[in-house]
Amino acid sequence: MLHQAFLIGAVYELEMSGQITKRLFENLNSRFYRSSGEHKFVSLIYGEISDAAQFRFLSAAQPFPLVFSAEHDRFMEVPEELCASFPPLGVLPSLDVIDRATTTSPLGFKDDYQMNEWLLMGAGDILLLCTDGLAEHSSGDARYFPDRLEQKLRGVKGHHARHIFEAIEADIRAFSEPSDDISLVVVKRL
């Protein structure tokens, strides 16, 4: 149901405004909050990259994207004011829900979603989107993220995105078998 609502909403938003807006996620959140059980939610990150390497995204309970700079050979720090994150869809109703007068929430209402906009990617830079399974991956007391991941990227940054992904995947498993699911998307600017 949520997937279909997203697809229909995305088509509508693209036709009406030429881009996906936070309004789509407000509507999805309201729909999911009203139609699901209290222990059900959806965490997600939605993003789009322009030809000019501007990255617009919305994060609902997902780790922030990482940008590995080919020029500086390290992860780039992103200022906190460029990093708005929100609770998962379905946990809290939106402040401006249409039927707010009849909507109850023991945990209160969430602030309006915001789209983050970054213009950080230079030639050869690598954008990583991942779930908390990668951010929390460990072997005993040793953690994979961020130092070992950054070291791996230094060694494979000259390759294409698929090779980078495969190298990270193999390195994660060599470090230790994951105890949580790990999702990873690798985007490389040419």
Regions found by a protein language model. Give the residues of each.
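Conserved long alpha-helical elements within nucleotide-processing catalytic cores of c-di-GMP signaling
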Residues: 1-5
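Conserved subregion of the PPM/PP2C metallophosphatase catalytic domain
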Residues: 8-190
